[in-house]
Protein backbone atom coordinates (compact mmCIF):
# COMPACT_ATOMS: atom_id res chain seq x y z
CA UNK A 1 0.00 0.00 0.00
CA UNK A 2 1.74 3.16 -1.22
CA UNK A 3 -0.95 5.77 -0.59
CA UNK A 4 -3.49 7.02 1.93
CA UNK A 5 -6.70 7.45 -0.09
CA UNK A 6 -8.72 8.44 2.99
CA UNK A 7 -6.38 11.35 3.76
CA UNK A 8 -6.44 12.44 0.12
CA UNK A 9 -10.24 12.33 0.08
CA UNK A 10 -10.34 14.54 3.19
CA UNK A 11 -7.83 16.97 1.68
CA UNK A 12 -9.74 17.41 -1.57
CA UNK A 13 -13.37 17.00 -0.46
CA UNK A 14 -13.43 17.68 3.28
CA UNK A 15 -13.29 15.58 6.45
CA UNK A 16 -16.72 14.07 5.73
CA UNK A 17 -15.14 12.01 2.91
CA UNK A 18 -12.50 10.38 5.12
CA UNK A 19 -14.57 7.73 6.93
CA UNK A 20 -16.37 6.26 3.88
CA UNK A 21 -13.09 5.90 2.00
CA UNK A 22 -11.36 4.47 5.08
CA UNK A 23 -14.09 1.82 5.43
CA UNK A 24 -13.74 0.85 1.79
CA UNK A 25 -9.98 0.75 2.21
CA UNK A 26 -10.25 -1.58 5.21
CA UNK A 27 -12.76 -3.87 3.48
CA UNK A 28 -10.42 -4.30 0.52
CA UNK A 29 -7.15 -4.77 2.39
CA UNK A 30 -8.54 -7.14 5.03
CA UNK A 31 -8.89 -9.74 2.26
CA UNK A 32 -5.12 -10.09 1.89
CA UNK A 33 -2.76 -12.39 3.82
CA UNK A 34 -0.09 -9.68 3.95
CA UNK A 35 -0.26 -5.93 3.51
CA UNK A 36 3.06 -4.31 2.62
CA UNK A 37 3.54 -0.72 3.74
CA UNK A 38 6.44 1.49 2.60
CA UNK A 39 6.63 3.37 5.92
CA UNK A 40 5.63 3.34 9.58
CA UNK A 41 3.41 6.32 8.80
CA UNK A 42 1.24 4.34 6.35
CA UNK A 43 1.38 1.25 8.59
CA UNK A 44 -0.12 3.31 11.41
CA UNK A 45 -2.84 4.64 9.11
CA UNK A 46 -3.65 1.06 8.06
CA UNK A 47 -3.90 -0.04 11.69
CA UNK A 48 -6.21 2.89 12.46
CA UNK A 49 -8.47 1.67 9.65
CA UNK A 50 -8.64 -1.78 11.27
CA UNK A 51 -6.17 -3.57 8.99
CA UNK A 52 -3.61 -6.04 10.35
CA UNK A 53 -0.93 -8.38 8.97
CA UNK A 54 1.08 -5.30 8.01
CA UNK A 55 4.74 -5.57 7.06
CA UNK A 56 6.92 -2.53 6.45
CA UNK A 57 9.19 -2.66 3.43
CA UNK A 58 10.51 0.58 1.90
CA UNK A 59 10.70 1.32 -1.80
CA UNK A 60 14.06 1.28 -3.53
CA UNK A 61 15.97 3.73 -5.67
CA UNK A 62 17.77 3.31 -8.99
CA UNK A 63 21.25 4.22 -7.78
CA UNK A 64 22.74 3.85 -11.28
CA UNK A 65 20.27 6.36 -12.73
CA UNK A 66 20.24 8.81 -9.84
CA UNK A 67 23.87 9.45 -9.00
CA UNK A 68 26.15 12.37 -8.04
CA UNK A 69 28.23 12.38 -11.22
CA UNK A 70 25.25 13.71 -13.17
CA UNK A 71 25.91 17.03 -11.44
CA UNK A 72 26.58 19.91 -13.87
CA UNK A 73 25.88 23.09 -11.95
CA UNK A 74 27.36 25.43 -14.57
CA UNK A 75 25.04 23.96 -17.21
CA UNK A 76 21.98 24.47 -15.01
CA UNK A 77 22.96 28.01 -14.00
CA UNK A 78 23.37 28.91 -17.66
CA UNK A 79 20.01 27.34 -18.52
CA UNK A 80 18.33 29.30 -15.72
CA UNK A 81 20.19 32.53 -16.42
CA UNK A 82 21.55 32.77 -12.88
CA UNK A 83 24.91 33.76 -11.39
CA UNK A 84 27.20 31.30 -9.63
CA UNK A 85 26.33 32.66 -6.17
CA UNK A 86 22.69 31.52 -6.51
CA UNK A 87 21.49 28.83 -4.11
CA UNK A 88 19.37 26.40 -6.08
CA UNK A 89 16.53 24.56 -4.35
CA UNK A 90 14.86 21.86 -6.43
CA UNK A 91 11.47 20.19 -6.26
CA UNK A 92 10.33 17.66 -8.85
CA UNK A 93 6.83 16.23 -8.92
CA UNK A 94 3.17 16.77 -9.68
CA UNK A 95 1.53 20.13 -8.92
CA UNK A 96 -0.86 18.39 -6.50
CA UNK A 97 -2.39 20.08 -3.47
CA UNK A 98 -0.87 17.64 -0.99
CA UNK A 99 2.64 18.44 -2.25
CA UNK A 100 2.45 21.85 -0.52
CA UNK A 101 4.31 23.57 -3.34
CA UNK A 102 2.84 26.85 -2.07
CA UNK A 103 4.82 26.38 1.16
CA UNK A 104 8.04 26.05 -0.86
CA UNK A 105 7.24 29.18 -2.87
CA UNK A 106 6.36 31.24 0.21
CA UNK A 107 9.50 30.06 2.02
CA UNK A 108 11.74 31.13 -0.86
CA UNK A 109 10.00 34.52 -1.01
CA UNK A 110 10.71 34.99 2.70
CA UNK A 111 14.36 34.01 2.29
CA UNK A 112 15.05 36.25 -0.70
CA UNK A 113 18.49 36.38 -2.32
CA UNK A 114 20.41 34.25 -3.12
CA UNK A 115 17.80 31.46 -2.98
CA UNK A 116 15.91 30.28 -6.07
CA UNK A 117 13.31 27.52 -6.30
CA UNK A 118 13.46 25.27 -9.36
CA UNK A 119 10.18 23.42 -9.96
CA UNK A 120 10.43 20.47 -12.33
CA UNK A 121 6.91 19.69 -13.53
CA UNK A 122 5.25 21.05 -10.38
CA UNK A 123 5.15 24.65 -11.63
CA UNK A 124 2.82 23.86 -14.52
CA UNK A 125 -0.10 26.28 -14.64
CA UNK A 126 1.18 28.37 -11.74
CA UNK A 127 1.55 32.15 -12.01
CA UNK A 128 5.08 33.54 -12.28
CA UNK A 129 6.72 34.25 -8.94
CA UNK A 130 9.93 36.05 -8.07
CA UNK A 131 12.78 33.60 -7.48
CA UNK A 132 10.68 30.67 -8.69
CA UNK A 133 11.65 29.02 -11.97
CA UNK A 134 9.35 26.45 -13.59
CA UNK A 135 10.84 23.78 -15.83
CA UNK A 136 8.70 21.41 -17.88
CA UNK A 137 7.92 17.84 -16.91
CA UNK A 138 10.78 15.49 -17.82
CA UNK A 139 9.90 11.98 -18.95
CA UNK A 140 13.50 10.75 -18.96
CA UNK A 141 14.61 9.95 -15.38
CA UNK A 142 18.21 10.68 -16.36
CA UNK A 143 17.21 14.24 -17.27
CA UNK A 144 15.47 14.61 -13.90
CA UNK A 145 18.56 13.23 -12.16
CA UNK A 146 20.78 15.76 -13.96
CA UNK A 147 18.66 18.68 -12.77
CA UNK A 148 18.38 17.42 -9.19
CA UNK A 149 22.10 16.66 -8.95
CA UNK A 150 22.94 20.11 -10.34
CA UNK A 151 20.95 21.94 -7.65
CA UNK A 152 22.27 22.61 -4.17
CA UNK A 153 19.49 20.99 -2.14
CA UNK A 154 16.20 19.19 -2.67
CA UNK A 155 13.07 20.55 -0.98
CA UNK A 156 9.92 18.60 -0.16
CA UNK A 157 7.12 20.02 2.02
CA UNK A 158 4.48 17.26 1.87
CA UNK A 159 3.66 16.43 5.50
CA UNK A 160 1.45 13.47 4.55
CA UNK A 161 3.80 11.76 2.13
CA UNK A 162 3.37 7.95 2.25
CA UNK A 163 7.04 7.40 1.47
CA UNK A 164 8.69 9.97 -0.80
CA UNK A 165 10.55 8.14 -3.57
CA UNK A 166 11.69 11.43 -5.12
CA UNK A 167 13.42 12.22 -1.82
CA UNK A 168 15.41 8.99 -2.12
CA UNK A 169 16.26 9.87 -5.71
CA UNK A 170 17.61 13.25 -4.58
CA UNK A 171 19.68 11.56 -1.88
CA UNK A 172 21.05 9.11 -4.44
CA UNK A 173 22.07 12.16 -6.51
CA UNK A 174 24.14 13.30 -3.55
CA UNK A 175 21.88 16.19 -2.58
CA UNK A 176 20.81 17.06 0.97
CA UNK A 177 17.05 17.20 1.56
CA UNK A 178 14.87 19.66 3.45
CA UNK A 179 11.65 17.92 4.49
CA UNK A 180 8.94 18.22 7.13
CA UNK A 181 8.97 16.30 10.40
CA UNK A 182 5.82 14.34 9.52
CA UNK A 183 4.75 11.54 7.21
CA UNK A 184 7.03 9.04 5.52
CA UNK A 185 9.77 11.53 4.63
CA UNK A 186 10.61 12.03 8.32
CA UNK A 187 11.51 8.33 8.51
CA UNK A 188 14.15 8.73 5.79
CA UNK A 189 15.53 12.22 6.35
CA UNK A 190 17.41 13.12 9.51
CA UNK A 191 20.21 15.58 10.29
CA UNK A 192 22.80 13.29 8.75
CA UNK A 193 21.25 13.69 5.28
CA UNK A 194 19.36 16.98 5.52
CA UNK A 195 17.09 19.09 7.67
CA UNK A 196 13.48 18.78 8.85
CA UNK A 197 11.10 21.69 9.33
CA UNK A 198 8.86 21.42 12.38
CA UNK A 199 5.72 21.98 10.28
CA UNK A 200 4.61 22.48 6.69
CA UNK A 201 4.63 26.22 7.28
CA UNK A 202 6.54 28.81 5.25
CA UNK A 203 8.26 30.34 8.29
CA UNK A 204 9.37 27.00 9.74
CA UNK A 205 10.41 25.77 6.32
CA UNK A 206 12.48 28.88 5.59
CA UNK A 207 14.26 28.41 8.93
CA UNK A 208 15.03 24.78 8.04
CA UNK A 209 16.53 25.83 4.70
CA UNK A 210 18.74 28.42 6.38
CA UNK A 211 19.78 25.86 9.00
CA UNK A 212 20.82 23.43 6.28
CA UNK A 213 22.93 26.01 4.42
CA UNK A 214 24.65 26.98 7.67
CA UNK A 215 26.17 23.49 7.58
CA UNK A 216 28.44 21.70 5.10
CA UNK A 217 25.90 20.78 2.42
CA UNK A 218 28.44 18.87 0.32
CA UNK A 219 29.36 16.59 3.24
CA UNK A 220 25.67 16.10 3.97
CA UNK A 221 25.08 15.28 0.30
CA UNK A 222 27.78 12.60 0.41
CA UNK A 223 26.14 11.11 3.50
CA UNK A 224 22.79 11.15 1.68
CA UNK A 225 24.26 9.19 -1.23
CA UNK A 226 25.86 6.68 1.14
CA UNK A 227 22.55 6.12 2.95
CA UNK A 228 20.68 5.67 -0.33
CA UNK A 229 23.25 3.10 -1.49
CA UNK A 230 23.47 1.13 1.75
CA UNK A 231 19.80 1.06 2.75
CA UNK A 232 17.65 1.70 -0.31
CA UNK A 233 19.40 0.30 -3.40
CA UNK A 234 16.88 -1.83 -5.27
CA UNK A 235 18.89 -5.06 -5.01
CA UNK A 236 18.76 -4.85 -1.21
CA UNK A 237 15.11 -3.78 -1.05
CA UNK A 238 14.03 -6.37 -3.60
CA UNK A 239 15.77 -9.15 -1.68
CA UNK A 240 13.95 -8.21 1.53
CA UNK A 241 10.62 -8.10 -0.29
CA UNK A 242 11.19 -11.49 -1.88
CA UNK A 243 12.01 -12.97 1.51
CA UNK A 244 8.58 -11.80 2.63
CA UNK A 245 7.00 -13.49 -0.41
CA UNK A 246 9.00 -16.63 0.31
CA UNK A 247 7.79 -16.70 3.90
CA UNK A 248 4.20 -16.39 2.70
CA UNK A 249 4.53 -19.18 0.12
CA UNK A 250 6.58 -21.44 2.40
CA UNK A 251 9.51 -21.38 -0.01
CA UNK A 252 12.55 -20.17 1.93
CA UNK A 253 14.61 -20.25 -1.28
CA UNK A 254 12.13 -18.02 -3.12
CA UNK A 255 15.00 -15.84 -4.28
CA UNK A 256 18.73 -15.66 -3.78
CA UNK A 257 20.65 -12.38 -3.54
CA UNK A 258 22.21 -12.85 -6.99
CA UNK A 259 18.78 -13.59 -8.46
CA UNK A 260 17.34 -10.47 -6.86
CA UNK A 261 19.93 -8.40 -8.68
CA UNK A 262 19.28 -10.21 -11.96
CA UNK A 263 15.51 -9.81 -11.76
CA UNK A 264 15.88 -6.10 -11.11
Positions of PLM-derived features:
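Conserved donor-binding/catalytic core segment of Leloir-type glycosyltransferases
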Residues: 83-99, 105-108
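Short alpha-helical donor nucleotide-sugar binding micro-motif in glycosyltransferases
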Residues: 146-151
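Nucleotide-activated donor-binding/catalytic signature segment of Leloir-type glycosyltransferases, i.e.
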Residues: 121-142
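Aromatic "clamp/platform" in nucleotide-sugar-dependent glycosyltransferases that forms part
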Residues: 159
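Carbohydrate-associated surface elements
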Residues: 41, 60
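Short hydrophobic beta-strand element within catalytic cores of glycosyltransferases
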Residues: 176-179
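Membrane-proximal helix-turn-helix segments that form the acceptor-binding/catalytic region
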Residues: 18-34
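Conserved acidic donor-binding segment of nucleotide-sugar-dependent glycosyltransferases
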Residues: 137, 191-202, 211-216
